[in-house]
Amino acid sequence: MNKKVKIIGAGLAGCEAAYFLANNDIQVELYEVKTLIKNEVQKTNNFAELVCSNTFRSQSLLNAAGILKAEMRRLNSLVIKIADSCKIDGDDALAVDREDFSKKLTDVIKNHPNITIIEQNVSYIDDENDLTLIATGPLTTNELKEDIQRLIGKQKLFFMDASAPIITKDSIDFNKVYYSGRHKQGKYICCPLNEQEFNKFVDDLVNAEQVQLKEFEKSIFFKGCQPIEQLAKTSKKLLLKGPMSPNNLLDQNNQQPYAVVQLRQDDAKDSLYNMVGFQTNLKWPEQKRVFQTIPGLEKAKIVRYGVMHKNYYINSPKILNFKLQVIRKKNVFFAGQITGVEGYIESASSGIWAAINILAFINNKKIKPLPNTTILGALTNYITNSKIYSLKPMKCNLGILEQENKYQSNDKFYSYNNSKNSLENYIEQLNKILRTNI
């Protein structure tokens, strides 16, 4: 097979993939449009621009973000290598000088002998002749978005304008909640509120501090999707007839509460639940404060906060296999936020994983999925698991890990050590199959 790969998008995922493949003697054509077409959030012409926060989150090996970065270091991540070199003070977080970070990373990519930079607005994917990785992120150009729709089907490309918080099941107080569901809805976890609790919740909600939307976002979101706090400001009745309706949600005593917050299972393992209809634009500390006033959620652990922003992503469980390869178009792979992962390190790490699978594809080698005991493996499984009915973008969290013996272990670093050992064993086998030296 021709050892040349087209990568569309020089963001975190695209640069990681290009770097990995180029270091394995694959010729890479890296396409980037930002010098030709500016989107609403870009500030410079450098690659992998950090347009939101300047932090890659915690370095602690007690949490998922720290463990994922450890996995990325072991996989020779360019993003983490550059981030380490640009670190600024930020407690235990890996915070960087964002301009220095993007400039250094761009220099590495542009000076790699196996990478050719092509400044072009790609509008057509030749899925028959070109081996292509699409890593265009949430702000994919309209022209390419239309061709992606041709490639995967018009109903398979989602526009996400809002999402609701996701919490862990084991943090719910089951002494205060019950299971119920309307008609053929299935069994949801129901958090009942009496009239006094409901009124206090609404007061807290409407007075909570919100994230300030950019001008280009304001025109997009409030047309088709009302955040929960906007509904509350409009009318309490909208909540009682909408996301907090108690109709046909009888409790254990066969009584109908004044209001109900429903929680819906969000993963195949039954460990994560999302707050139904609670799309929100509240600041994250405010989400925690306000939503923990709901009975049963006083100690709720939020693993993904509600967000509102422009974001294109594909319905990966229906389109991609575990290799991040289009099931019906074997020459096409996806990586980054367009796959449904959310966050800098999640996007970058998916680029590494896609590149590993592209290398295997080029060499006609079969490799197994990453173990679900690793953060990257569990996250990849989450976004490509065909059992998920409707994919919502996900940051890494410990709730998606496979860790059967965690609660029998006294090791507070159990998740990290389990991930480390699993990844080492996997890499040992991978190096033998692909004749690499990771």
Swiss-Prot record:
Disulfide bonds: none annotated. GO terms for biological process: tRNA methylation; tRNA wobble uridine modification. It is found in: Cytoplasm. It catalyses: uridine(54) in tRNA + (6R)-5,10-methylene-5,6,7,8-tetrahydrofolate + NADH + H(+) = 5-methyluridine(54) in tRNA + (6S)-5,6,7,8-tetrahydrofolate + NAD(+); uridine(54) in tRNA + (6R)-5,10-methylene-5,6,7,8-tetrahydrofolate + NADPH + H(+) = 5-methyluridine(54) in tRNA + (6S)-5,6,7,8-tetrahydrofolate + NADP(+). FAD binds at residues 9-14. Signal peptide: none annotated. GO terms for molecular function: flavin adenine dinucleotide binding; tRNA (uracil(54)-C5)-methyltransferase activity, 5,10-methylenetetrahydrofolate-dependent. Its cofactor is FAD. This is Methylenetetrahydrofolate--tRNA-(uracil-5-)-methyltransferase TrmFO 1. It comes from Mycoplasma capricolum subsp. capricolum (strain California kid / ATCC 27343 / NCTC 10154). The lineage of its organism: Bacteria, Bacillati, Mycoplasmatota, Mollicutes, Mycoplasmataceae. The gene is trmFO1.
